UniProtKB/Swiss-Prot annotation:
The RxLR-dEER motif acts to carry the protein into the host cell cytoplasm through binding to cell surface phosphatidylinositol-3-phosphate. It comes from Plasmopara halstedii (Downy mildew of sunflower). Its main location: secreted. GO terms for cellular component: extracellular region; host cell nucleus; host cell plasma membrane; membrane. Secreted effector that suppresses pattern-triggered immunity (PTI) in plant host. It is found in: Secreted; Host cell membrane; Host nucleus. This is Secreted RxLR effector protein RXLR-C11. Residues 1-19 form the signal peptide. A motif (RxLR-dEER) lies at residues 58-75. Keywords: Host cell membrane, Host membrane, Host nucleus, Membrane, Secreted, Signal, Virulence. Induction: Expression is up-regulated in spores. InterPro entries: RXLR (IPR031825). It holds the Pfam family RXLR. Belongs to the RxLR effector family.
Amino acid sequence: MHFSLVLLVFAAIVIPICADTSTTKDYDDKKSLQTSNFGTAAVANMLHVLQSSDNSKRLLRMNDKAVISDHEEERSSLVKNKQKKLSYRIKKGWENVKKPFKKSAKIIEKPLKKGSKIIIEPFKKVSKIIKKFAIKGAKIVKKPFKKSARIIKKSFKNLN
């Protein structure tokens, strides 16, 4: 269709400049058209070919498909190029973002390593002290229960 429109526009602009009378032939159908104006003869001939000839219709369809496929190839290549550029920019930007964080992470890790030793040591000492008191307290707590358990056992024996 696009091809036929281009030919029609070409016929409307260029052909009126040519001679007044002409004879054009459609070699596919062996018919001749004779008109007084070369421009109208060309347009009539083209319309006749478009309407009657299956070969020309096939050629036009193939031309349209070729144009569409060319546009799709161009479009897909443009999309691929833009995706590559975008991914490249994202990688570069991400590297620029990561670098300061890596440096600051190292700066933060060093005091934390030193500070963790300072923080952990008192907890170790305190936990040892707590364990000692917990063991002593458990013994203190167990003793009355042992006594009461003995008393309860004796009372059950007396009941039987």
